[in-house]
A protein has these predicted regions:
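C-terminal transmembrane beta-barrel domains of outer membrane proteins
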Residues: 52, 125-136, 141-178, 189, ...
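Generic recognition of flexible, low-complexity loop/linker segments
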Residues: 70, 85-89, 99-101, 116-118, ...
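Generic "edge-of-domain/loop-turn" microfeature
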Residues: 8, 13-15, 91, 106-108, ...
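Transmembrane beta-strand segments of outer-membrane beta-barrel domains in Gram-negative
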Residues: 11-15, 22-24, 37-44, 51-54, ...
Length: 456
C-alpha cells in the first residue's frame, strides 16, 4: 500500500469511540498539505503535529514509521491518547491508504499539595509543598513546573546565637521542551534526535542553630531514549551550583571548623561554585516490559555516569593570569570554584529461577578525583557507604573510608573511591510476605591521605 493522504483530528474522544460523538469537528485548516480538524480551538501548533509525524504521503506503508509516530506523540505531555487509523481509498485498482492521526487532549494544568511530619531523635517538625504544572505552556507540549516548599523542625539541645530551630524555604522552576534545542543546528537533525530539552532554576534557604546556608542552581540538559526504551541518555550541558554561607555560629566554628583535624568539614562550610557538565547512560534489557509492568523475567541494567567541573574556568583563569586567593585557589566573583573528574559504573542482574524464587546480583564502582583548583571534593560529590543501598551491615554513612573508624561528632565518613557488590536470594513466602538472604561487600577510600581521616 501507498500512503495517499494524512489528516489530523485533534479532539478525538476515546471514551466514545463506538459512537458518532467520538469525533467533534467545528473548524479546520491546512498546513503544508496536511488537513487539521479541531473542535473549538487548536491547542497544539500545526508545526508540532507535522514535525512528530513519520508517515509521509506518497511513500509505501511502513509499520516501523507508524510505531515511530506513536512514540513521538507519546512523548507529548499535552496529549492523553493517540490512535492512527488507515482506510483504503475507494477507487478501482487502488492500493492507497488514507491515514487519520486521532489525538485525545490531556489535562494541561494541575496543582498538587504535599504535607509531611518528621521526628528526628525526638525533635518534631513539619513540611509542606505546593506545585503547579502546565503541560502545554506555549502550545508545543512544553511542560512548565513551579514548586514551593517550606519546612520547620524544633531543634533541642543546641544553644546558638543565630536560631534555635531549623527552617527551610525552597523554590524550583523547570521547563521541558519535547524537542532538541540548540543554536545553529538544522531542523532535520532536531527531528531525528528526538531529544527533550530542560532548563531549570532552584533556590534553597536553610537556617539552623549552627549556620545559615543558601544553595542556588541553574541547569540546561538533554534527555533521549532509543532501542524501544532500553537505552536512555542524559547530557547535562551546563549545571551551575552556588553554595553561600552568610552566617556560621561562633561556637560551632570554634568547636569544629577551626580545628586542624576537621579540614574536610571546614572545606564544606565555605562559599563555593560548582560549574559542571555531565553525561549519563542507562541500559535496561527489559525495555518496554518494565514500563508496562508486564512479565520481565531475566534482565539486567547497566548505568554509566561521567561528570567534570571547573576545567573551563580554570583554563580561563590560568590563561588570563588571574591571581589566587589566600588559600591558593582561583575564584569566580571572589568565590572559589570546585574542579574534579568523577565516573561511576553500576551493573545489576535479576535471574529468575521459577515463579517464586530469583537471584539478584549487583556491582558498583566509582571514583572522583579533585585536582587543579581543588584539593578536596565538595561534600555533595563524595561517596558514602552503608545503609539499605550499600553494605547493609552498617548504618548509612557509617562505614569507612578504609579502616578509619569515624568520629561521632562530625560527618567525615566519606571518600573519593567506592566499591559495592552483593548477591541476594529472593523468595515468595505467603500472601504479601517476601523473604531474602544476601551477602554484601564494599567500602569507600580516599585518594589522598587526609589528616582528619587516618587510614582512609
Amino acid at each position: 500500500y501507498t500512503i495517499n493522504k494524512v489528516s489530523f483530528i485533534t479532539d478525538y474522544n476515546v471514551l466514545q469511540a463506538s459512537t458518532q460523538n467520538s469525533i467533534e469537528v467545528n473548524d479546520s485548516l491546512h498546513y503544508k498539505g496536511f488537513p487539521i480538524y479541531y473542535k473549538d480551538k487548536l491547542y497544539l501548533r500545526p508545526k508540532v503535529l507535522t514535525n512528530n509525524l513519520r508517515i509521509t504521503p506518497g511513500t509505501l506503508y511502513n509499520e516501523q514509521n507508524v510505531q515511530r509516530t506513536y512514540s513521538n506523540y507519546g512523548r507529548l505531555q499535552a496529549l492523553k491518547y493517540t490512535n492512527i487509523r488507515f482506510f483504503e481509498v475507494q477507487q478501482s485498482d487502488s492500493a492507497k491508504l488514507n491515514a487519520y492521526v486521532m489525538l485525545t487532549r490531556g489535562k494541561h494544568q494541575s496543582v498538587s499539595f504535599e504535607v509531611e511530619g518528621t521526628n528526628s531523635a525526638g525533635d518534631l517538625g513539619a513540611a509542606a509543598s505546593v506545585a503547579f504544572q502546565h503541560r502545554n505552556m506555549f502550545k508545543g507540549s512544553e511542560t512548565f513546573m513551579f514548586k514551593l516548599r517550606g519546612a520547620y523542625e524544633a531543634v533541642s539541645g543546641l544553644q546558638s546565637s543565630l536560631n534555635q530551630d531549623y527552617i527551610e524555604l525552597g523554590a524550583e522552576a523547570t521547563i521541558n521542551f519535547p524537542r532538541f534545542m540548540f543554536p545553529f543546528v538544522s531542523s532535520d537533525f532536531k527531528r531525528r534526535i528526538r531529544a527533550t530539552t530542560e532548563f531549570g532554576l532552584q533556590y534553597n534557604y536553610q537556617m539552623r542553630p549552627e549556620f545559615t546556608r543558601i544553595v542556588a542552581s541553574a541547569g540546561w540538559s538533554y534527555k533521549w531514549g532509543v532501542q524501544q526504551q532500553r537505552s536512555q541518555h542524559r547530557i547535562d550541558l551546563l549545571d551551575i551550583n552556588y553554595l553561600y554561607m552568610p552566617s556560621i555560629d561562633q561556637t560551632f566554628k570554634e568547636d569544629y571548623l577551626e580545628k586542624d583535624e576537621n579540614y574536610i568539614l571546614k572545606y564544606n562550610y565555605e562559599d563555593r561554585f560548582i560549574v559542571r557538565t555531565g553525561y549519563s547512560y542507562i541500559y535496561n534489557s527489559a525495555g518496554r516490559a518494565l514500563m508496562n509492568n508486564s512479565g520481565i523475567g531475566n534482565s539486567y541494567t547497566i548505568r554509566l555516569n561521567f561528570e567534570s567541573a571547573g576545567n573551563l574556568l580554570y583554563a580561563v583563569a590560568k590563561l588570563g593570569g588571574m591571581k589566587k586567593n589566600a588559600s591558593g585557589e582561583y575564584t569566580l566573583l571572589n568565590i572559589p570554584f570546585a574542579q574534579y573528574l568523577k565516573g561511576d559504573f553500576d551493573f545489576a542482574k535479576n535471574l529468575v529461577i521459577d515463579n517464586r524464587n530469583s537471584l539478584a546480583f549487583h556491582f558498583g564502582a566509582g571514583i572522583a578525583i579533585p585536582y587543579g583548583n581543588a584539593t578536596m571534593l565538595p561534600f555533595e560529590k563524595r561517596y558514602f557507604s552503608g545503609g539499605a543501598n550499600s553494605v547493609r551491615g552498617w548504618s548509612v554513612r557509617n562505614l569507612g573510608p578504609g579502616s578509619f573508624p569515624g568520629d561521632n561528632n562530625v560527618m567525615n565518613q566519606s571518600g573519593d573511591i567506592k566499591l559495592d557488590a552483593s548477591i541476594e536470594y529472593r523468595t515468595r513466602l505467603f500472601w504479601k510476605f517476601r523473604g531474602a538472604l544476601f551477602v554484601d561487600a564494599g567500602n569507600i577510600w580516599t585518594i589522598r591521605d587526609y589528616k582528619d581521616q587516618p587510614g582512609g
